[in-house]
A protein has these predicted regions:
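Short, small-residue-biased leader/transition segments that mark boundaries at the very start
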Residues: 1-13
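Extended, low-polarity segments enriched in aliphatic/aromatic residues
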Residues: 11-229
């Protein structure tokens, strides 16, 4: 078992992993410590390749463990966001955020000017590149707890408003993220879910799911099976 860490300087990434307790559970592998590799995605509308950490190629299977929550740019972050931005190297993150316009990290201004739907489509396409490479050797778990409207990557996120919902798993990342979105909207406490719903709607968050379906990455229909006792 390895934790995957990306894009910050190696020493900083290692320190953060230790501070958050990851190193006590499993070895941490900083995938882009040795650079990037390209995963082709010919079907892409926005990007024709995904740039991931070169150590990605050392693995023959992955479990994508994601904290489902809001996101200031994507609207929500789940399996697809984690698979795209999470696996991406530093340059790969810029490539996705600029919808294939800029590869080198540096000034983040171009990313802030990217069309929203183009950004969401780029994330879906980067996920597709990872899925094409791994085939059936990948599974997904979304943990729905401490749901803030902001991502964990935000240094000063809004406090979580929604209570824990549960842990969901699937072999289909599209269905998994759709189920999580639906559970947010189905929350009986509308006052606490309102902010996250508004964040997703403002960012047109479901478009990543729409485009993922267009690309054949999964389905938005699902059967939610409860296994808790």
């Amino acid at each position: 078992l390895h934790w995957m860490v990306h894009s910050f300087p190696t020493r900083r990434s290692s320190d953060l992993a230790k501070d958050h307790g990851f190193t006590a559970i499993a070895e941490v592998d900083i995938l882009d410590e040795t650079g990037s590799v390209s995963l082709p995605f010919p079907a892409g509308k926005r990007i024709k390749e995904d740039l991931v950490g070169s150590r990605f190629l050392n693995y023959d299977s992955f479990l994508v463990l994601s904290h489902f929550k809001g996101h200031q740019m994507g609207g929500f972050g789940g399996a697809l966001k984690n698979m795209s931005i999470g696996f991406a190297s530093a340059d790969g993150k810029m490539w996705i955020h600029t919808a294939g316009a800029v590869k080198k990290t540096g000034d983040f201004t171009p990313a802030m000017k990217t069309d929203q739907n183009a950004f969401l489509e780029s994330m879906a396409e980067a996920s597709g590149a990872v899925m094409n490479k791994m085939g059936d050797n990948i599974a997904y778990v979304n943990v729905m707890n401490n749901l803030s409207i902001d991502c964990d990557c935000n240094g000063n996120p809004a406090p979580p408003e929604m209570a824990d919902i549960g842990i969901l798993a699937s072999l289909d990342p599209v269905a998994l993220d759709q189920a999580c979105v639906d559970l947010v909207y189905a929350s009986p406490d509308k006052k606490k879910s309102e902010a996250l719903c508004k964040r997703m709607e403002k960012q047109n968050a479901v478009h990543i799911l729409e485009h993922a379906v267009e690309l054949g990455l999964g389905r938005r229909e699902y059967n939610l099976v409860k296994i808790d006792k």
